[in-house]
Every structure is written in C-alpha cells, then in structure tokens.
Amino acid sequence: CMLYAQDKNTSSFLFDDFQEAVVYFKNGSQFREKMNYNILANKFYFVDRVDNKVKALSNPQDIQVIKFSNRVFYTEGNNGIEILPTNPVLYVQYKGNMRKEASKGAFGQPTETTSVKTYGGTYAGRGERYDFDPEKLILGSRYNIYWIEQKGKKKPFKNFNQFLKL
C-alpha cells in the first residue's frame, strides 16, 4: 500500500501524502476518501477503506468536481485540472516527464549511464507507446500547463511572458 509519496523530488504524486477529498458526481452522489493525483499517469487515486489498497478512480467522465480542502479539480478526459479561485478564472494542469529507473550496472549498483530513456507522458518522442510499470518509472521533472478564461474561452499559456500577451 502506497499511502505516502516517497521522495518529494521523484514522487509522481501531486501531494506529499494522500489527502481527504470529496468527489462530486454529475448524478448528485458524493464519494469521500483519501486521494492523490498522479501527474505521470494523469489519474486520481484513492485508498480503498475496505482493503486499504491504492486504486485508480474510474469513470472520470461521470465526475463533476473533486475537492481537496479548498482546492477544486475537474476532469477533462483522464486529466485532473485545478480551478484557481481568481478573477479571471485560471486553470492549472500538473504534468511531469518520466524516466526509467536506473539500470543495474557493475556489482548490481544502479547507474544512469548504462541506458536511460526519457519519456514525456506515456509516449516516447517518436510516438511509440510505452506501457509503464509505476514501480519502474520515476519523475524526471515537473511542469504545469495554464489556461485563463477570457470571453468564455480557455486560452493556454506556459509562462508569464505568454500570459502578458493575452
């Protein structure tokens, strides 16, 4: 059971540990569990109270919003996107590049010089599909994608200079 993200620098989870959250479904029902968001898998995970195992939240299309204390997320496809309480409304998608766990080198010691590939999401640079085992891949780097809502439309930006041009 992975209740806590291991190392802040390499953890693929948004939060340091699983947080109390409420999932509000489009049909009006609610679901309360300890949850976290995996920025590499682009999925919300929860700790099942019955067997204490970490499981992926299914049917994201049926979810209205997910609230972690005062933070609000919605799902777009499998992606979790945070709605920031600003005027105008800002949206943030938390992302990460993954890299394969270091290979074993001489004397069984891990080494990153033997053969390391870096992946952005679950596709390699040439579009080849890479089905990853979460235990074998670690977070390479984190980055965010931002949108601002203007005149009913979401406009993307990646940095402050792009924001100023909107």
Locate predicted features:
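Bacterial Sec-dependent N-terminal signal peptides
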Residues: 1-10
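N-terminal secretory signal peptides
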Residues: 9-53
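Aromatic-patch recognition
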Residues: 34-161
